[in-house]
C-alpha cells in the first residue's frame, strides 16, 4: 500500500524506533595458596545481555490511515485508496521485541605439585537462559481507508493484535539449561626435555522443560515413524572429552622443539536456534488478524472474514478511556478468540521447527603437530611449521523430516549427482529439525618465520 514516509504520506515521531544493546557483567575471583604445593582458584561470573528495540511512544495502537482514493495535489499519486496517507502510534514491530541472555558460571580449580607432576582438577557449573520475544502488533493495529473514517468513527478495514495466552503480557520463547563439568589434568615433566600432558573432562547437559507445552496436533504427525514433541527439549546427555599432548625439546636448549597433541573438544551453539521450537509451536501467543473478507472467523471456524462493525465508533478503550492492548484483547476474547490454550487445542502450523531429542552440543576431534626451530644466526630468527586436522564428532545440521530418504532415488549424471526427488517425495508439513551429524572434517597447514635483525 505504498510507503509510510514519502512525498505523499507522513509518519508521526512516535512511530519510529531505535535499538538498545545492554551488557551487565560481574566477576568474583578468589585465589588461595595453602602450601607451597597446593593452591586454589574460585571464579564466579555473571553476564546479562539484553538486545531490544525501544521507542519514545507510550503504549498506543499503531494506526495506518490510507488516502481514501483521493489523488495527490499534483495528480501523480494513485487514487485506488490503497496508498498510505498517515501513520502514527507505537511502532508495529517494537513492542516486546527483544533477545535476552543470562549466564552465570561457578568454577573451582585445585592445583597440586607432586614431584614432576602438576595436577589440576576442578568442577564447573553453568546456568544459561535465553529468550526471544517477538510480538508483532503487540499494542494493537488499526487500518482505516481514509482520514474521514478515522476522525468520524468509521469501521476500520483491518484490526490486528498479538497477545500472550493465559494473560501473559510478555510472551517469549525461552530455553534454559544447566551444565555441570568435572575435569582433571596432569602435566608430567618426564625428563628435562620431554613434557607429557593428559587429561579427561566430563560434561553433563540438562535442559529445563518447564517453559514448554506439547502441541498434540504436531505430536500426532508421523514422519516415517518419528514424532515431534514441542513440549520437550533434548534428553540429558554426558560428553566425554579425553586429551593428550606433548612438548619435546630435542637438545634441551629450545633450538629444536616438537609439539603436538590430540583430543576431543566441545563447543557452544547460539541458543536462539533452540527458541525456534517454542516460537513455531503456536503455544505461546495468538496472532489475531481481522478483516471482512479473508480473516479466520472464530464463530464458524472458516477463513471467510469477520463482521467488523463492532469496531465502529473509534479505538477500543479501557474503563479509563485509554486504547490499551488489554482492552482490545478483552474485546477479541468476547468475540470468540482464544484466551488460553491446552495441548489438545494446538493446531499444525505452516512449518515446524524442532530439536532432536538426542541432540548434543558440537564436539570435534582435534589433532595437531608442529616443529619450532631456532636458526643459528647472529639475531633472533625462528621457523615454525604446524599442521592441524579436525574431525567432526557432533556438528549441528538442519534436516527437513518431511522429505523422504533419498536412497534409491535416481540421480543426475556427471559431476552434479544430486538425487532427483519425484512427485510425492515429501510427507506432511515441513519440519526443520536441529540434529547432529558426524560428517565433516578440515585441515590446515601453516609455516611462519619470525626474525628480529635489529632492535
Residue ranges of predicted features:
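Transmembrane beta-barrel strands of outer-membrane/channel proteins
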Residues: 1, 42-48, 121-127, 198-204, ...
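Outer-membrane beta-barrel and related beta-rich outer-membrane complex signature
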Residues: 3-11, 46-66, 125-145, 208-216, ...
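Membrane-embedded beta-strand positions in outer-membrane beta-barrel channels/transporters
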Residues: 25-27, 105-107, 181-187, 197, ...
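Residue-level signature of outer-membrane beta-barrel architecture
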Residues: 32, 112-114, 188-190, 202, ...
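Repeated loop/turn-to-beta-strand initiation elements of outer-membrane beta-barrel proteins
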Residues: 37-40, 117-119, 194-196, 254-256, ...
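Solvent-exposed loop/turn elements at secondary-structure boundaries
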Residues: 211-241, 245-433
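Outer/extracellular conduits and scaffolds centered on Gram-negative outer-membrane beta-barrels
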Residues: 236-240, 431-455
Amino acid at each position: 500500500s505504498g510507503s509510510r514516509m514519502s512525498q505523499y504520506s507522513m509518519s508521526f515521531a512516535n512511530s519510529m524506533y531505535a535499538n538498545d544493546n545492554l551488557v551487565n557483567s560481574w566477576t568474583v575471583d578468589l585465589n588461595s595458596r595453602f602450601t607451597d604445593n597446593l593452591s586454589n582458584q574460585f571464579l564466579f561470573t555473571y553476564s546479562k545481555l539484553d538486545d531490544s528495540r525501544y521507542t519514545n511512544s507510550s503504549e498506543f495502537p499503531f494506526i495506518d490511515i490510507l488516502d481514501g482514493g483521493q489523488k495527490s495535489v499534483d495528480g501523480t499519486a494513485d487514487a485506488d485508496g490503497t496508498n498510505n496517507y498517515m501513520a502514527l502510534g507505537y511502532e508495529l514491530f517494537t513492542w516486546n521485541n527483544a533477545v535476552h541472555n543470562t549466564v552465570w558460571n561457578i568454577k573451582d580449580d585445585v592445583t597440586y605439585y607432586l614431584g614432576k607432576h602438576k595436577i589440576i582438577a576442578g568442577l564447573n557449573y553453568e546456568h544459561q537462559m535465553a529468550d526471544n520475544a517477538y510480538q508483532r502488533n503487540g499494542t494493537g493495529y488499526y487500518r482505516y481507508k481514509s482520514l474521514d473514517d478515522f476522525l468520524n468513527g468509521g469501521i476500520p478495514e483491518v484490526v490486528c493484535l498479538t497477545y500472550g495466552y493465559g494473560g501473559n503480557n510478555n510472551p517469549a520463547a525461552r530455553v534454559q539449561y544447566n551444565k555441570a563439568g568435572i575435569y582433571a589434568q596432569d602435566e608430567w615433566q618426564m625428563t628435562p626435555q620431554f613434557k607429557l600432558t593428559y587429561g579427561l573432562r566430563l560434561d553433563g547437559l540438562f535442559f529445563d522443560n518447564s517453559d514448554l507445552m506439547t502441541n498434540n496436533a504436531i505430536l500426532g504427525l508421523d514422519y516415517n515413524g518419528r514424532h515431534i514433541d514441542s513440549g520437550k527439549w533434548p534428553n540429558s546427555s554426558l560428553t566425554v572429552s579425553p586429551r593428550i599432548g606433548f612438548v619435546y625439546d630435542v637438545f634441551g636448549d629450545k633450538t629444536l622443539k616438537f609439539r603436538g597433541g590430540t583430543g576431543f573438544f566441545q563447543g557452544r551453539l547460539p541458543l536462539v536456534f533452540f527458541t525456534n521450537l517454542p516460537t513455531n509451536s503456536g503455544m505461546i501467543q495468538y496472532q489475531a488478524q481481522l478483516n471482512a473478507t479473508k480473516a479466520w472467523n472464530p464463530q464458524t471456524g472458516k477463513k471467510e472474514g469477520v463482521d467488523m462493525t463492532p469496531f465502529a465508533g473509534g479505538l477500543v478503550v479501557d474503563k479509563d478511556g485509554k486504547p490499551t492492548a488489554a482492552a482490545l484483547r478483552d474485546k477479541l476474547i468476547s468475540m470468540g478468540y482464544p484466551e488460553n490454550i491446552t495441548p489438545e487445542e494446538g493446531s499444525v502450523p505452516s512449518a515446524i521447527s524442532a530439536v532432536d531429542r538426542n541432540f548434543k552440543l558440537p564436539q570435534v576431534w582435534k589433532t595437531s603437530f608442529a616443529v619450532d626451530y631456532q636458526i643459528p644466526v647472529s639475531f633472533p630468527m625462528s621457523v615454525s611449521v604446524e599442521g592441524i586436522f579436525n574431525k567432526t564428532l557432533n556438528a549441528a545440521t538442519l534436516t527437513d523430516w518431511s522429505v523422504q530418504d533419498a536412497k534409491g532415488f535416481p540421480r543426475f549424471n556427471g559431476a552434479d549427482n544430486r538425487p532427483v526427488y519425484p512427485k510425492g517425495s515429501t510427507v506432511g508439513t515441513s519440519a526443520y529439525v536441529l540434529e547432529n551429524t558426524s560428517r565433516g572434517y578440515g585441515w590446515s597447514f601453516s609455516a611462519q618465520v619470525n626474525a628480529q635483525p635489529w632492535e
